[in-house]
Regions:
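Structural/interface elements that position substrates and couple domains in central-metabolism enzymes
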Residues: 2-82, 86-106, 110-144
Length: 144
């Protein structure tokens, strides 16, 4: 599904809190770069990583699963393989009341999960990176 720049910009403007599923604490991993960038742009990042639950990262408690989140979340950003998407989406839909957007990172698509979330009124973005889109849409892309 093609999405417009206006649609993406509206999502990124309205979003305040992002649960990042699969966020790595390893500074060389793409999920770390994305989380750090979004955090420095004022987004509240809730890290979700089963291997690091209970630690703190970006000033937030790392949750082992979506089920451990007990605060409002606007977006779930998925950094996991496509096979993991159905469980993440189902858990997010069941637990995160008020959730507005499911975002699947570059290389991640899952049509039935995307369709399910859309049918419930959520925005769904597949195969894109919010860091790249934010930089592009808000004029922060820099030449190397």
């Amino acid at each position: 599904m093609s999405v417009s720049d206006i649609f993406l910009k509206d999502i990124l403007t309205a979003t305040k809190t992002i649960a990042m599923v699969g966020l790595s604490m390893n500074e060389t991993r793409p999920s770390y770069f994305v989380g750090r960038y979004l955090h420095t742009r004022g987004y509240k990042i809730i890290p979700v990583n089963a291997g690091h639950g209970g630690k703190h990262f970006f000033g937030q408690l790392v949750r082992s699963s979506i089920d451990e989140i007990d605060e409002p979340v606007d977006m779930v950003d998925i950094f996991r393989k496509p096979e993991a998407v159905p469980e993440i989406v189902n858990d997010s839909l069941a637990k995160l009341k008020g959730l507005k957007t499911i975002w699947m990172q570059i290389g991640i698509k899952h049509e039935s999960s995307a369709q399910k979330a859309r049918q419930l009124g959520l925005n769904v973005i597949e195969d894109r990176c919010p860091k790249i889109e934010h930089q592009r849409l808000f004029g922060e892309l820099r030449k190397a």
